[in-house]
C-alpha cells in the first residue's frame, strides 16, 4: 500500500470523506481499530477506492500464466478500464476507481491468462455468477457481484470478507438501499450468505444453503415429535 501511495501524484486534495472511508474500510478489514498511519496511507492512494488499494497487494502477487503484472504495471497502464484510462476519462474530484472497475480491467485485459492460472476455476465460476447478475439488467446487482468476486478471490489473506458494511462502502450506498439488491441476488441464487463469515460469497452449483438445511431439519424433527407425541406421553 505504501508503494501505491508513493506512486500516485495527486492534484486534488484528499478530503475528509476519503479519510473517513479509508478508516471504515481499514477497521472492517481486521475488526480492530486501525492505526492512524494505515488510514493515512490508504487515503494517499486516492483516487483509488480504499478497497482497491488493499486488494491490489495480493492481486499483484498472483502470477497469471506467463503474464506477470506488478502494481506499477496496473498504475501506468493505458489499457481499457485501467487506472490511466480512468484518470483520462473521469472526474476524479467526484469519482473513485472502484472494485467493479478493477474487475472489468482484469476481465478485458487478463482473462485468458487468469483462466489458465491456479485461480482459473474460481474465476470461471465468478464470471458465470456475474453473467447471471447481468440478466437482471440491474447495474447495482452487477457491481455487487463483481465486488464479491474480487473479495472472494483476493481478500482472504487480508481477513477481508464481503459483509453488508463492506459492500455498502464499496458502492457508496446506504445499508437500506443495498438490502433489496442483496435479497434479489440471494433469491436468484447468484450470491449466498455465509453465517460463519457474516458475509456474502458468490453462489456456485456445489454450494449448499446450510441455513435452509437446518431449518428443514428443524421442521422435520418438530413434525415428527408432533406426530408421535401421544406415544411419547404414554411412554412417560
Where are these regions (language model features)?
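Amphipathic alpha-helical segments of the small helical/lid subdomains adjacent to P-loop NTPase cores
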Residues: 1-82
Amino acid at each position: 500500500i505504501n508503494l501505491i501511495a508513493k506512486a500516485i501524484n495527486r492534484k486534488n486534495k484528499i478530503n475528509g470523506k476519503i479519510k473517513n472511508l479509508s478508516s471504515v474500510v481499514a477497521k472492517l478489514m481486521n475488526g480492530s481499530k486501525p492505526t492512524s498511519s494505515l488510514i493515512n496511507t490508504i487515503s494517499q492512494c486516492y483516487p483509488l477506492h480504499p478497497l482497491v488499494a488493499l486488494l491490489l497487494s495480493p492481486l499483484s502477487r498472483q502470477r497469471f500464466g506467463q503474464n506477470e503484472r506488478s502494481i506499477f504495471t496496473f498504475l501506468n497502464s493505458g489499457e481499457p478500464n485501467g487506472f490511466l484510462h480512468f484518470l483520462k476519462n473521469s472526474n476524479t474530484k467526484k469519482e473513485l476507481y472502484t472494485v467493479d472497475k478493477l474487475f472489468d480491467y482484469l476481465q478485458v485485459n487478463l482473462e485468458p491468462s487468469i483462466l489458465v492460472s491456479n485461480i482459473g476455476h474460481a474465476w470461471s465460476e465468478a464470471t458465470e455468477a456475474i453473467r447471471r447478475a447481468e440478466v437482471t439488467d440491474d447495474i447495482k446487482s452487477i457491481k455487487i457481484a463483481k465486488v464479491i468476486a474480487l473479495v472472494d478471490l483476493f481478500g482472504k489473506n487480508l481477513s477481508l470478507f464481503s459483509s453488508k458494511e463492506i459492500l455498502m462502502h464499496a458502492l457508496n450506498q446506504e445499508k437500506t438501499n443495498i438490502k433489496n439488491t442483496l435479497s434479489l441476488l440471494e433469491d436468484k441464487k447468484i450470491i449466498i450468505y455465509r453465517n460463519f463469515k457474516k458475509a456474502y460469497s458468490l453462489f456456485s452449483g456445489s454450494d449448499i444453503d446450510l441455513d435452509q438445511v437446518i431449518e428443514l431439519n428443524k421442521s422435520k424433527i418438530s413434525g415428527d415429535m408432533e406426530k408421535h407425541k401421544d406415544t411419547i406421553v404414554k411412554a412417560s
